[in-house]
Amino acid sequence: NPWADPEAEANPEAKATAEATAEAIAEALAEPEPALPALPLLAFLFSLPAVQHWVEKNWING
């Protein structure tokens, strides 16, 4: 699997959390008028190491 992430495979809970977070962010951004109160929440979520790692692995470097 070219998308395999050994660190995430070793911690499936972090992987699931990061994936769910990324899906929630994608859904929020897909709204015609994204809810501005969600911005601090998004900033907090992106500050989490597991989320940063997933984003780097799947969006930036992928």
UniProtKB/Swiss-Prot annotation:
Where does the record place the modification Asparagine amide? 61
- Location relative to the cell: Secreted
Per the record, where are the segments of Acidic residues compositional bias?
Answer: 1-10
Composition-biased stretches (Low complexity):
11-20
- Main localization of the protein? secreted
Chain spans, region Disordered: 1-20
Tissues showing expression:
Expressed by the venom gland.
Q: Could you name the Gene Ontology cellular component terms for this entry?
A: extracellular region
Highest taxon listed in the record's lineage: Eukaryota
Entry's family note = Belongs to the formicidae venom clade 1 family.
Q: What does this protein do?
A: Vertebrate-selective toxin that causes pain by targeting voltage-gated sodium channels.
What is the official name of this protein in its record? Myrmicitoxin(1)-Pr2b
